[in-house]
Amino acid sequence: MIKSDIASTVPIIAIDAMGGDVGLDTTLAAVLSVKNQYPALKLILVGNQSIIEKHSLFPQIASQMEIVHAEQIVAMDESPSSVLRHKNDSSMWRALELVQQGKADACVSAGNTGALMGCARFILKMLPNISRPAICSTVPNRYGHVHWLDLGANVSAKPEQLKQFAIMGSELSKAVDNIASPTVGLLNVGSEAIKGNDIVKEANTLISATDLNYVGYVEGNDLFLRKDLNVVVCDGFVGNVALKTVEGIAKFIQYGMEAEFKRSFFSRLTALVALPALKRLKKRIDPRMYNGATLLGLQGLVIKSHGNADPIAFANAINLARLEVENNVLHRICEQLQLNPEHDQ
């Protein structure tokens, strides 16, 4: 449901209570945390009502919570086609239906990414003039953070689709970062004009012709070291591989530091001295604080939480949905698409 102006009422967010690897323990703890922070926010739990009501945390939120019953659960390894055929009474499906029916402003799910994308496209449909959806996530860098898309919705993308991603990413940054004119970069193998394949070169031409604050080609290291960068655009194959590489390197460094600090008495002493700085660094790059990827390009707001998110991480995904509803991201994107009409898709 696309609203025509900035939301004037309290956001209503549908929560897929049964999705993800950890289930209700995480979901209800996160909901309790968010409700304590934003008491007026309306959250709808979607899932097996009997199981939800029997959970030990439910009495603490029962008076503030609506439950929409759904009999089925989407497994994390279930194929999108199987879910579309057989799981139309699942918590994921029913949560998306609430958005489609205008009974909720956004849906948050920690469920199967492929199934969520497939169901969202089927139930909510694509925005006018958007041919492909994109997964947009926020990653920390030296100067704050950057919004990065596409991170896996499409293994390839046409130049026109990369332009669409740039428009959607820019509007998302305006909404959640409160930046009037976010900078947008196109991920490439080099910053020189001669670098890149034909798709990237044509996308560069198309994005340059828009009214976006486009800074041209950017390289992988720019995501973390460049100050004047708010949005980075690429196809889903490149984005997903790059993101998982970064996540792997981060874990490698973490494990390596832990091993070295435990190696001897002196290294333990060094760790003790460095502990305050290490805690600050850990908090700054804590992936839980950036949990929640937006499925852009749909006629409804959908936030994908990490499947193994803890309560802190899942609460941040809910808060991202709240922020996007309050700033009417969908309407902003639609307005920009009208200012930058499509050519061949």
UniProtKB/Swiss-Prot annotation:
Pathway: Lipid metabolism; phospholipid metabolism. Coiled coil: none annotated. Pfam families: FA_synthesis. Keywords: Cytoplasm, Lipid biosynthesis, Lipid metabolism, Phospholipid biosynthesis, Phospholipid metabolism, Transferase. GO terms for biological process: fatty acid biosynthetic process; phospholipid biosynthetic process. It catalyses: a fatty acyl-[ACP] + phosphate = an acyl phosphate + holo-[ACP]. Signal peptide: none annotated. SUPFAM superfamilies: Isocitrate/Isopropylmalate dehydrogenase-like (SSF53659). Catalyzes the reversible formation of acyl-phosphate (acyl-PO(4)) from acyl-[acyl-carrier-protein] (acyl-ACP). This enzyme utilizes acyl-ACP as fatty acyl donor, but not acyl-CoA. NCBIfam families: plsX. Belongs to the PlsX family. This is Phosphate acyltransferase. It comes from Dichelobacter nodosus (strain VCS1703A). The gene is plsX.
